[in-house]
Each structure stands twice: as structure tokens, then as C-alpha cells.
Regions:
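Acidic, glycine-anchored loop motifs typical of Ca2+
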Residues: 38-53
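General structural concept
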Residues: 13-20, 31-40
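Alpha-solenoid repeat scaffolds
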Residues: 26, 68, 146, 172, ...
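Aromatic-lined, polymer-binding surfaces characteristic
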Residues: 125-129, 133-143, 151-198, 213-232
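Aromatic (Trp/Tyr) and acidic
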Residues: 1-10, 19, 44, 79-131, ...
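Alpha-helical solenoid scaffolds that mediate protein-protein interactions
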Residues: 19, 54, 61, 68, ...
Length: 392
């Protein structure tokens, strides 16, 4: 789909920022020229592609704060015929600004009377705001030296939004997966990234106060809290180590449920995203507590993506592996084709226990839709695995 969902955008920016920060990825195979509005693949321009991608996503996030002073749920076409459009996304609109004074077929080259412009949904959401500023704070660190002006704007925006949200009651409007996660989870993300970016003890204090959130959703937050250990006191570190010991017993339960040793989701959307996040968490835990969390708990996540899973042995990363996903729901879905490097949701467990991933029908979104946030987290995971293999 071509909806621009803010939650997706800030996940991508965060994952890519962490990947650049932790692995110093310097690949350059893309030319990006903002002035000319031109992108050319396989044409190096002397700039790391990942920084250009982070910059692009960050500009989308910061534009919301510049315009409205907050994050917004997202942008999407207004008409169902556009939503089900199967061709090039460029042709979903006439790319002209709508003018209600014009007839539907009238245009002056800049505006038209065709009511096809995308809509921005602007509901207030404190959790969404926190998720957005977490990404902006992370981006500010890696954009220093690359786009200093944007980096400075990002961290200042993040600090100011944090202050504003803590000066009032939270806006808790919630709709689907467009308004952020829970208030506590998103606030914790923001606190962690702001602590890493500013070193301000205020955020460390708030993180300590939020221990119940860390404890309750350890599978969600384990990786990020490992990054801030140097800023935390001994009491926090000890509580964290004790929680890792409990977590070690929890992940052993996965081996009882399935032979792959990973958490296979049973909801209406297949669980590759959850499995990748699980493996990334285990990477950070292994780096901090190698005596408690074995590196195999990281490898299992990538092994699952590459074919060690129910239903088949196909790789869920298109173009990677001897047999990979070749029919997927992406920009070229009408052609029953694929995009190399795209990651699909994977095996869906049909109730009660039937694993399914159709290899010949791209339109089952929950099995075969590429989503960019999983692509970004995959980039992190594959580099994490390479790091472990190179340092055995």
C-alpha cells in the first residue's frame, strides 16, 4: 500500500539510525539529488546510502512538527479506487494540487480540479508524539557531520516535545495501528533515545521510574535498555541482570512450542517482524550478558527468515537464498513479481494450527506484503549476525 504511516516511518528511521550507529554501514550505490528531485540506483554519489535514507525519513517526520507542532497518524489517498490501485504509485494522483474552483478536467499545469490529493490525518496522540521524537533523537546522533542543521533541529524538537507532553495531560486518542503503541512503551523509547543523545540525567531518572514497563514488556524493551547501562545506577543494573535471568527461562519456552526456538505469532498478520525484533533483542542481551544469552538465540531469528520455518524452506527475503520469495505484495504486485531485499510477513498460522504461506498469490497481505519497517530491522539483524560471526 502507499499509505505513509508515521509509526512505520519512525520505526524505519530508528532501526536505520541504530544500524549505522552500531555497524558503521558505508555502502554507497545510490545517487540522491533533492534539488533535481532525482534518484538513480547503482550510481554512487559519495554518500552512505543509509544516511540518505535516514535523512529522507527524518525530513518526513520533522515536517509534521514544523507544520502542526506534533506527529500525525499519516497520509493516504482519499478514494477506494486509489487505494486498490495496482500500478505505479506515481499514477495514483495527477500530481497537481487540487483547486475546488476548477472543473474536474481543468488544469493550469500546477493545479487541477481533480479531487485526488492525498489526505493528512492529524489527530493528536501523545504516544505517537513520543515515538516520533524517539526517532528524531536517534537520527540527530547519526546526522551530525552529515546534515548538521537537520540534526540540531531534530534534537531540539525532541527535547521541546518531551517538555510539552510532560506539562499536560496526555492525548490518548487511539485508532488501530496509526496512533502509536501504549503511552508507557512509547514514552520509554523517547526517554532512552533522549538520554543517549543528551546525556541528561533527567531522562535516566524517568527510565528508572518506568521499571515496571521494562519488566512487563521486556521482550519489547530489552535491546534498547542495554544501550543505556553506562548511564544507570547499580540498583538498576542489578534489577536488569535479574530480569535477564528470568527472560532466559522465558525464551526456553519457545523451544517447547516449536522446533525453531522463536516466537511464532498466531494473529492475523504473520510474525516475521516479531521474530526479527526478538533476535535483535537477543543480540543486545548476548553482548551485555554472554553468560546468560547464547548467540544461537540471535542466529535462530535469521535462520527462520532464510528457510528454517514451517510450511516450506523458502527464504522470506526476496533474492536471498537458493529459493526465495518471488511473488509478493509490493509496488509490482500486479505483475506477480518481487523486489530484491523485501521481507514478507511469513507463515500465517490458520486456526487452530495450520501453517500457510502462499507462494503464488501476492494479495494475502498478512503473508506476503513487503513492509519497510521489517526491511529496516532485517538490515540491523543481518549486520548483528555478521558481527557475531566475525568475532567468534
Amino acid at each position: 500500500d502507499y499509505d505513509i504511516r508515521t509509526q512505520t516511518q519512525y520505526y524505519v528511521v530508528s532501526h536505520l539510525a541504530h544500524a549505522y550507529e552500531d555497524f558503521n554501514l558505508q555502502r554507497d550505490q545510490t545517487l540522491v539529488d533533492y534539488d533535481a528531485k532525482y534518484v538513480d540506483l547503482h550510481n554512487p554519489d559519495g554518500k552512505p546510502d543509509i544516511l540518505q535514507q535516514i535523512e529522507h525519513g527524518t525530513l518526513g517526520l520533522i515536517a509534521q512538527h514544523r507544520t502542526l507542532g506534533r506527529a500525525i497518524p499519516g497520509i493516504i489517498v482519499p478514494d477506494i479506487s486509489q487505494y486498490t490501485h495496482l500500478g505505479d504509485g506515481l499514477t495514483m494522483t495527477d500530481n497537481l494540487i487540487y483547486d475546488k474552483e476548477m472543473d474536474p478536467l481543468e488544469t493550469d499545469g500546477y493545479k487541477s480540479g481533480k479531487f485526488d490529493d492525498r489526505w493528512a490525518f492529524t489527530s493528536k496522540s501523545t504516544p505517537l508524539n513520543y515515538g516520533s521524537i524517539a526517532a528524531l533523537a536517534a537520527a540527530s546522533r547519526v546526522l551530525k557531520g552529515y546534515n548538521d542543521e537537520l540534526a540540531e533541529e531534530c534534537i531540539n524538537t525532541a527535547i521541546n516535545v518531551w517538555k510539552e507532553e510532560h506539562s499536560k495531560e496526555p492525548d490518548l486518542f487511539h485508532h488501530g495501528n496509526t496512533t502509536g503503541g501504549t503511552l508507557e512503551d512509547e514514552e520509554l523509547k523517547a526517554a532512552v533515545e533522549l538520554l543517549l543523545s543528551t546525556k541528561d540525567e533527567m531522562y535516566a531518572t524517568r527510565i528508572k521510574e518506568m521499571w515496571p514497563t521494562i519488566d512487563k514488556n521486556f521482550n519489547l524493551h530489552a535491546g534498547r535498555v542495554m544501550k543505556i547501562l553506562t548511564y544507570m545506577d547499580e540498583d538498576f543494573k542489578q534489577k536488569l541482570k535479574n530480569r535477564v535471568k528470568d527472560y532466559k527461562n522465558e525464551i526456553a519456552e519457545h523451544r517447547k512450542e516449536n522446533p525453531y526456538g522463536v516466537p511464532i505469532g498466531r494473529r492475523g498478520w504473520a510474525g516475521n517482524s516479531q521474530i526479527v525484533s526478538y533476535a535483535i533483542n537477543n543480540y543486545h542481551l548476548h553482548k551485555a550478558f554472554p553468560d546468560l544469552i547464547d548467540k544461537e538465540e540471535v542466529f535462530k531469528g535469521l535462520n527462520y527468515l532464510y528457510g528454517t520455518h514451517p510450511d516450506s524452506d523458502i527464504s522470506f527475503v526476496s533474492g536471498v537464498g537458493t529459493k526465495s520469495k518471488k511473488v509478493a505484495y509490493g509496488m509490482n504486485r500486479a505483475d506477480f513479481s518481487f523486489i530484491a531485499g523485501g521481507v514478507v510477513p511469513g507463515v500465517l498460522i490458520l486456526k487452530p494450527d495450520f501453517p500457510e504461506n502462499k507462494e503464488d498469490w501476492p494479495f494475502l497481505w498478512g503473508e506476503n506484503e513487503y513492509v519497510v519497517n521489517v526491511g529496516a530491522s532485517y538490515i540491523y539483524l543481518v549486520n548483528a549476525v555478521r558481527d557475531l560471526l566475525n568475532n567468534q
